Amino acid sequence: MQNIPTGVILLNMGGPTQTKDVRPFLYNLFSDREIIPLGPRLMQKPLAWLIAKRRAPKSAATYERIGGGSPLKQITEAQAEALEKSLQAHGNFTVTYAMRYWPPYCDEALDYLLSKGVERLVALSLYPHYSKATTGSSLTQLHKTLKKKNISLPLTEIPSWPKQRDYIAAIAANIKKGLATFHGEKTEIVYSAHSLPTSFIEAGDPYVEHTKQSIGAIEEITGKRGRLCFQSKSGPVEWLEPSTPDVLIQLAQEGVKNILMVPISFVSDHVETLYEIDILYKKQAKKLGMRLTSCPSLNTQEQFITGLRQLVLESSVNSD
């Protein structure tokens, strides 16, 4: 497959690039029934409009705290460029990206790849842990767009990669560097993953199991155990527990003084890392008498890009 012109699409969530984009971004997000079904199907979009209107002011203020918008588009574009460069010695690859809830969407990505003359497609999710709400929704949208455009090119999907060797090694290296900043003081490692409604897991979603697989593989390298918790819950449904704020309270009660927080389900910086972890949770930890430092997101770290390259190459071999 490597000699066949191949288009790689990185799939990610997307985010508002300016504060004026926040409300329409939220509308797009809550219009997706694969994340949160809002009553009968015909009520999904009207309710999404109301929720977006209500939440937009607070959400926009949050984005103002991290520079006025999400950096996810720029980071994902940089990841695509780095991956294409990494693949150059291995075949004829063109790499682009498609966001789920804010431009550029799948149709733009496909138009670009077709203009490059690709004959095969690889859809690589930038969510290492599969969930119907993330990778599942992105792949559904990709298939809809392919059908709408009447594109019948061979498609290989890479929906999850919780134990990919280079991904695991890159996080383990970041953890070791993070622990070194505490100069030998006892430090608790906390893995913070994005939360999901528990109904997803009860319906068979492998997200939590995939997350635990990643942590287990990381701990084999570091030799250090950590705690898993879940952040960013919203809405009146039951969410995965324990929540990250609750774990911070628990650690303070246990007398912990130092915390290294690892954004385990996030490979790129965005509002959940730059605001929730680096601002909210650091502030909470300080109030509780603890020092909290976070590991950086992988973004375009060389070893992480190597891992993405290996995923693409392995999928190419397997599909031949």
Curated annotation (Swiss-Prot):
Coiled coil: none annotated. It is an enzyme of class 4 (lyase). Fe cation binds at H194, E272. GO terms for cellular component: cytoplasm. Its EC number is 4.98.1.1. It is found in: Cytoplasm. InterPro entries: Ferrochelatase, Ferrochelatase_AS, Ferrochelatase_C, Ferrochelatase_N. Pfam families: Ferrochelatase. The keyword Calcium does not apply. Disulfide bonds: none annotated. GO terms for biological process: heme biosynthetic process. One of its GO terms (molecular function) is ferrochelatase activity. Keywords: Cytoplasm, Heme biosynthesis, Iron, Lyase, Metal-binding, Porphyrin biosynthesis. It catalyses: heme b + 2 H(+) = protoporphyrin IX + Fe(2+). Belongs to the ferrochelatase family. This is Ferrochelatase. It comes from Desulfotalea psychrophila (strain LSv54 / DSM 12343).
